[in-house]
Amino acid sequence: MAWKRLILFLFIFSVSAEAQEFRINKITDLDAPWGSTFISNKELLITEKSGKIKLIELGSGNVTEVIHNLKILEDGQGGLLDILYLDEVIFVSYSEDHGKFKSTTSIARANLDRGELKFDNIFVAQPPINSGYHFGSRLAVKDEFLFASVGERGKGMIAQDP
């Protein structure tokens, strides 16, 4: 039994002894960052709840705001939420402004353009309501399918009535 412990100890020690060093750089000038996605080995897109999309150049630390056409209502837990890059396409989830303080969770896509992203909605949750809660909004891709979490907006019965 003692030899098993010795092997485990040596394995753990050898793995940690060969661990690579890494460097941590702090990204500043962000306001309530929510989601992030790498678009290359050297570039990262970050969403801010207020509605801004920031392009971060990892080597220089340069931060640039990317213009977009989304109608975002930042209210309570809502705003510009998750972001995902896949094959030159950017997907975002956000609380879409429908006027008169009504909003809903929407998902949009745009072709990658570092200067301006022109989004088109591919999903709009119904109905838009006056609530700043439970938008959900995490995005993931598996086997070429886009998955999204969508909240019940603090109105539990909406989720029970498809």
Q: What residue spans do the PLM features occupy?
A:
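Short, flexible helix-coil linker/hinge segments at the edges of structured domains or between repeats
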Residues: D161-P162
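Acidic, Gly/Ser/Thr-rich repeat motifs that build Ca2+-stabilized beta-propeller blades
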Residues: A19-I158
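Sec-dependent N-terminal signal peptides
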Residues: R5-S14
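N-terminal secretory signal peptides that target proteins for export/translocation
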Residues: M1-W3
